[in-house]
């Protein structure tokens, strides 16, 4: 892979190449991606989607939106720091093509901003609830009518693949969705493969999948345009990662490790003294002890340590990337950057504490149970009504259910897979609050 091709400004529907030197420097081409994402309704819905504590009304607990904004800030720093090194190593990128280190920052920031845009309501349990509706729930009956890969898309519903659809799906009059640049789409694609074969190797890029069967052709177009390296054979499609996808992943890893931990401390799920023991290992080289001692509140002390910890992890992630840049361009770096960080052991310790004390806390478990019930009931009602309408057997009740769908979802789907995936897509874009409201309306539940 080469950087000139990887930094593609091309957008869905373009006939030719967009040149960096022709871009308006007052609003860089890649900055347009960030703007389009942040103004999208799918991004706005993240303000009422949970990050750690489902349905939490506590002000300092992060939603998906605040988490995504923070990941984009970390991603921008990672991109600029790496971009500065890349431009210095390959000066022709600037001299001949006009690329700047800020382009790297803008790409990674935009992809990081969108990294959770396809995730269903109620945290990570939302993905599992959709998958289990098909694998062990009422959706099992559709298995024999789908191909193996279509079925896998449903039983292993993946927020990353759904996010690719959110960013790229066309609607009448809106060709190409948000029309994000190929470079930003490449950085967004942490798992550039289809759902089968499942985890064929230990390569980090094979851990999950990145596109549904409906998006396969366009995914291939984007990958080939940027020169991503194919790594599957026969009828299976997969590619090595776009190098900047490693930075998006690192930004997310850094934020959820440190900031989810911070949420747990502020909620009282992890004691401050216990947390300090682990955070200090990340900041021992940068902490100003005298300043730390002047901070009077727990929130200020933890905030100070969090900022230092994120700074330490950013610098180390950049170091790992730059040291392995040649291997990354060859598609021969099968690890997450933070897996090779000198702080990996410390991060693993913090993640273990978060799993034991935060992710498995009673409040989280209780709310995820509620989320399971809501999502699976909504899937059943809307899929049944949608299919009955298609075959001309819709009841008045089915018609009423379908009237609850926003106008943009009243699209005819000629095949069963398309209809099932369309309803999954609709459910996944609901906020926690809207999903709960739909559930209460359909079940006639009282507040």
Question: Where would I find each of the regions flagged by the language model?
Answer:
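Acidic, carboxylate-rich catalytic segments that either coordinate divalent cations
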Residues: 1-16, 20-23, 393-447
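Sequence-structural signature of the catalytic-core scaffold of metal-dependent phosphohydrolases
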Residues: 1-26, 38-49, 69, 73-74, ...
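Acidic, low-complexity proline/glycine-rich segments
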Residues: 32-44, 339-346
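A short small-residue
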Residues: 49-59, 232, 353-358
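Low-complexity, highly charged intrinsically disordered N-terminal segments
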Residues: 62-66, 70
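A residue-level signal for conserved active-site and pocket-lining positions in enzyme catalytic cores
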Residues: 163, 375, 427
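C-terminal subdomains that position terminal phosphate/3'-OH groups for nucleotidyl transfer/ligation
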Residues: 284-418, 430, 442
């Amino acid at each position: 892979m080469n950087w000139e091709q990887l930094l593609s400004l091309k957008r869905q529907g373009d006939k030719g190449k967009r040149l960096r030197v022709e871009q308006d420097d007052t609003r860089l081409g890649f900055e347009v991606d960030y703007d389009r994402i942040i103004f999208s309704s799918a991004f706005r819905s993240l303000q009422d989607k949970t990050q750690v504590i489902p349905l939490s009304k506590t002000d300092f607990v992060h939603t998906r939106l605040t988490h995504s904004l923070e990941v984009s800030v970390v991603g921008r720093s990672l991109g600029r720091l790496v971009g500065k090194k890349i431009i210095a190593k390959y000066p022709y990128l600037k001299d001949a093509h006009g690329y700047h280190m800020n382009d790297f920052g803008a790409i990674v920031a935009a992809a990081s901003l969108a990294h959770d845009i396809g995730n269903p309501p109620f945290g990570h349990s939302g993905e599992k609830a959709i998958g289990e509706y098909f694998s062990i729930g009422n959706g099992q009956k559709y298995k024999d009518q789908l191909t193996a890969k279509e079925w896998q898309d449903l039983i292993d519903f993946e927020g990353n693949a759904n996010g690719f659809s959110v960013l790229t799906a066309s609607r009448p009059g809106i060709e190409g969705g948000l029309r994000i640049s190929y470079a930003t789409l490449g950085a967004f694609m942490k798992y550039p493969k289809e759902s089968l074969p499942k985890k064929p190797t230990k390569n980090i890029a094979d851990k999950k999948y990145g596109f549904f069967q409906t998006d396969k052709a366009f995914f291939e177009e984007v990958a080939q345009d940027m020169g991503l390296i194919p790594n599957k054979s026969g009828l299976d499609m997969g590619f090595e990662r776009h190098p900047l996808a490693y930075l998006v992943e690192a930004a997310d890893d850094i934020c959820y490790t440190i900031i989810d931990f911070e949420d747990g401390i502020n909620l009282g799920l992890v004691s401050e003294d216990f947390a300090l023991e682990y955070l200090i290992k990340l900041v021992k080289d940068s902490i100003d002890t005298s300043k730390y001692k002047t901070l009077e509140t727990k929130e200020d002390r933890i905030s100070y340590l969090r900022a230092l910890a994120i700074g330490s992890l950013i610098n180390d992630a950049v170091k790992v990337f730059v040291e392995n840049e040649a291997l990354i361009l060859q598609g021969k770096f099968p690890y997450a950057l933070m897996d090779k960080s000198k702080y990996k052991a410390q991060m693993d310790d913090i993640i273990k504490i978060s799993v034991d004390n935060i992710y498995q806390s009673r409040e989280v478990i209780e709310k995820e149970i509620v989320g399971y019930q809501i999502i699976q009931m909504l899937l059943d009602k809307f899929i049944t009504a949608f299919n009955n309408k298609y075959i001309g057997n819709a009841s008045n009740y089915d018609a009423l259910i379908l009237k609850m769908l926003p106008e943009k979802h009243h699209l005819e789907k000629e095949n069963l897979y398309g209809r099932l995936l369309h309803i999954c897509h609709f459910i996944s874009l609901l906020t926690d609050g809207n999903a709960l409201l739909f559930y209460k309306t359909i079940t006639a539940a009282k507040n």
